[in-house]
Amino acid sequence: MAIERTFSMIKPDATKRNLTGAITKMLEDAGLKVVASKRVWMSRRQAEGFYAVHKDRPFFDELCEFMSSGPTVIQVLEGENAIAKNREVMGATNPANAAEGTIRKVFALSIGENSVHGSDAPETAEQEIRYWFSETEIVG
């Protein structure tokens, strides 16, 4: 098993409902360690940059509007197979398809307001972590 890092974000729908602690606890209970964390209210421009990979998708404008509508909590998580573990704990993107006990099954309001985001691959994790954090902000 490899120790790796991944990017995790608690989205505005969850921060507005004061779920940051409950979600972080679920991640930590799964064996993931928070090695960096900050609360950020994204500008529209930051949201567009972060989600640039989706710029040609029909949901892009709505996504950027939502992500800049309130605070997010962005984190770097570390642990054995952290990327896969984080995705397992988050659950399927659509909460209707998420397994019982996952973050999205428990907390998501809809497919759009699904409470969390997490990197899907090592390359994505590296890009997303670098987008928000400097090396000196990550303390393992």
Swiss-Prot record:
Residues at which ATP binds: K11, F59, R87, T93, R104, N114
Cell location: Cytoplasm
Keywords: ATP-binding, Cytoplasm, Kinase, Magnesium, Metal-binding, Nucleotide metabolism, Nucleotide-binding, Phosphoprotein, Transferase
Disulphide bond pairs: none
Main location: cytoplasm
Catalytic activity: a 2'-deoxyribonucleoside 5'-diphosphate + ATP = a 2'-deoxyribonucleoside 5'-triphosphate + ADP; a ribonucleoside 5'-diphosphate + ATP = a ribonucleoside 5'-triphosphate + ADP
A GO biological-process term: CTP biosynthetic process
Oligomeric and partner information: Homotetramer.
Protein name per its UniProtKB record: Nucleoside diphosphate kinase
Species whose genome carries this gene: Chelativorans sp. (strain BNC1)
Gene name of the record: ndk
